[in-house]
Amino acid sequence: MAEFAAHTVKSFDEDIAQLRAVITRMGGLCESQIAESVDALMSRNAEAAQIIIENDKRLDALEAEAEALAVRIIALRAPLADDLREIVSALKIAGVLERIGDYAKNIAKRSAVIAQSQPVGPAVIIPEMARLVVEIIRDTLDAFVDRDPVKALALLQR
C-alpha cells in the first residue's frame, strides 16, 4: 500500500476521503446490481429485474455526486501531481462504474423479456462470468482506494 503524507489543510484530506467513499459506494452498488441482475435472469424473476432497473437511478446520482465533488476539489484546492491524478482517476472510474450499472440494468431489462419466453440452451456460464466481473471490480476499487500500484498492475495480469 502506498503511503502519502497528510496535507497541511485537513479539509483537503477529508474531501479526497469523501470522493473515495463515493467511488466505493458506487462500486458496491455495481457489484450488487450485477449479481442481482444475473440472479433475476437465471431465475426468470421479472419483479426482481424491475427493482434493479429502478435502482440504476441511485448509480446515476452517485456519479453526479462524484463529478460535482471532483470539480469542487479541483476548483477550490488546485491539486497537483498525485492528488490531481487521483481525482481524475476517480472521475473516470465513476463514469465506468455508471456504465457497468447501465449494463446490469440492460441485463435486468432483458431478463424481464426472457422470463416471458421459453427457456433456451444452457446458460450456466453466465453466473460464473458475473462472479468474475464482480471480483475484478472489487479488486480494482481496492487498488484505487489503497493507492496500491502493485495491486493495480496485478490486475493487468489476470
List each language-model region with its residue ranges.
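Cytosolic, long alpha-helical scaffolding segments
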Residues: 1-158
